[in-house]
Design a protein with these regions (language model features):
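C-terminal helical cap(s) of enzyme catalytic domains, especially alpha/beta-barrels
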Residues: 78, 101, 116-134
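Short loop-to-alpha-helix "cap/lid" segments that border enzyme active sites
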Residues: 16-23, 40-50, 54, 62-82, ...
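Metal-dependent enolase-superfamily TIM-barrel catalytic cores that perform enediolate-based chemistry
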Residues: 4-40, 47
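Glycine-rich phosphate-binding active-site loops on the catalytic face of alpha/beta enzymes
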Residues: 3-20, 57-66, 105-124
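Glycine-enriched alpha-helix->loop->beta-strand junction motifs that scaffold or abut catalytic
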Residues: 2-9, 29-33, 50-60, 80-82, ...
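Catalytic cores of alpha/beta
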Residues: 2-4, 41-51, 87-110, 122
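Active-site flanking residues adjacent to catalytic metal/cofactor-binding acidic residues
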Residues: 37, 57, 87
Length: 134
């Protein structure tokens, strides 16, 4: 990834071991790359180390592909306060983004909602306006 010009890598806890996660995180840090550690449930929180400064919670169940936004709210109680939290998948409402921000999330991965629309650019602009509106 680094040789291709990437500035960050995604480590999906469900796809690698804890040892691999730690090894890849250390290597990325040596290469001055950011790491997004993606978790899917409570059982994966033991992948978190002090080296993980960005942690994503994927609301999509990898087995059924069903999304449950409550996962991000539940997992917020288990995440280190000094990390940047990213809520991933299933977000289609600006009010949800506000609620997630209120519990500590700083980033949001929203793709399907915009890509399924006929006007992704226009919908993104409206979505952002709704988020920042008082």
């Amino acid at each position: 990834a680094n040789l291709s010009g990437a500035s960050a890598i995604l480590l999906i806890a469900a796809a690698i071991t804890k040892e691999e996660s730690l090894r890849f995180t250390k290597l990325a840090n040596q290469l001055k790359m950011d790491v997004l550690l993606e978790l899917h449930d409570e059982s994966e929180t033991d992948y978190i180390t002090p080296l993980n400064s960005v942690i994503g919670i994927n609301n999509r169940n990898l087995g059924s592909f069903v999304t449950d936004l409550q996962k991000s709210f539940h997992m917020a109680k288990l995440l280190p306060q000094d990390a940047v939290w990213v809520s991933e998948s299933g977000i289609s409402d600006a009010n949800i983004v506000r609620e997630l921000r209120d519990v500590g999330y700083k980033g949001f991965l929203i793709g399907e909602y915009f890509m399924k629309s006929g006007n992704p650019e226009g919908n993104l602009k409206r979505f952002i306006q709704q988020i920042v509106a008082p």
